[in-house]
């Protein structure tokens, strides 16, 4: 399965209400490290069926990115039962 693009319309359903843990990739197209990480995130999405892998474009939803306290990118966040469990910056 490929990574799911998260937008305003599907955030609650795909992230907060997901039955599986969610690996959320906060990125921007202009971010060099994000572009390097992107293929790895896509590979994880293909290989793992126990976690939903999603991509979150920070420029499209800056308020929601701020809600997650994303100050720099890339950020990978693990969401379980609608709550932030862990995150890795950089």
How would you label these PLM feature ranges?
Residues 4-8, 26, 37-63, 70:
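Thiol-based oxidoreductase modules, predominantly thioredoxin-like and allied folds used
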Residues 5, 22, 87:
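Conserved beta-strand positions that form and line the central face of beta-propeller blades
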Residues 11:
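Substrate-binding pocket helix/loop in short-chain dehydrogenase/reductase
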Residues 17-27:
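Short active-site neighborhood of thiol/selenol oxidoreductases, capturing the structured segment around
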Residues 21, 39, 74-76:
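Short, proline-centered helix/strand-breaking motifs
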Residues 31-34:
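Short cysteine clusters
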Residues 72-90:
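Non-catalytic, surface beta->alpha helical segment in thiol-disulfide oxidoreductase systems
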